[in-house]
Amino acid sequence: MGKVKYVLLDCDNTLCQSEHLAFEACADLTNELMAEKNIEQRYSAASLLEDFVGYNFRGMLNGLKQKHGFELSDAEMERYVSQELDRVTTKLSDKAVECPNVTTQLEWIKSQGYPMSVVSTSAKSRVVASLEKCNLDRFFKPEHVYSAATSLNPPSSKPDPKIYNYACEQLGVKNADAITVEDSKSGATAAMRAGIPCIAYVGIYGIEDSAEKMDQMGKLLTEQCKCVAVMKDWNEFPDILKKIESS
């Protein structure tokens, strides 16, 4: 594809180990919603992750509505979204850590002159909380942190490609001239639909689950989402980028 003109990066479980922390907070709030709607099922962080990894809370609520057959008024939706953001941001500000070797590779990307941007499905304040806690915010201009939940009107959520299309438009780069890194099916699907070559970062599954899950996700993201490479550790990034540019 020639020289990459922009490196786009997902945040949750790609740059920062934040997804499980966020889902711990989400599970408590989701169970409050289930009780309010007189639905017996209760969720753990693990069971929510299984069904909704890569979704923001608004997207998760829409999925729960469909799955359990209840309604939420606009006011209820906004109340729950606001509560979730407050709880998750507090937790991430306290406990988020970077994925292994991210700082080293962001330093390398910067040293090679590649511009970088974060393109997340999560609310911007939540993303910034994770980046700041991990000391990664120094790599990104504030205006180059994009959120499907808060940068778009109306809000969206991956796998909808709108946030990728919006980010590329704002950055002045053609979709096909950028690359991105994603860990989830929803994120990689958004990249695929936007026509942006995507590297599947599966190292997080080895950390949080197992080597078997890591291999399984690499296969899924390659076959179903057309990811151009699988990355098990961030230290593999320079070689992967070189192969992409020479392809």
Tell me the role of every PLM-derived stretch:
Residues 1-4, 107, 124-247:
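Asp-based, Mg2+/Mn2+-dependent phosphohydrolase catalytic module
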Residues 2-11, 15-103, 107-112:
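N-terminal helical cap/lid subdomain that shapes the substrate entry/recognition surface
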Residues 14, 120-122:
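Conserved phosphate-coupling serine/threonine residues in phosphotransfer and NTP-handling enzymes
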Residues 15, 116, 180-181:
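Conserved SAM-binding loop
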Residues 49, 93-94, 116, 152-153, ...:
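A generic structural signal for short
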Residues 116-119, 136:
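Hydrophobic, well-structured mid-protein blocks that either form specific transmembrane helices
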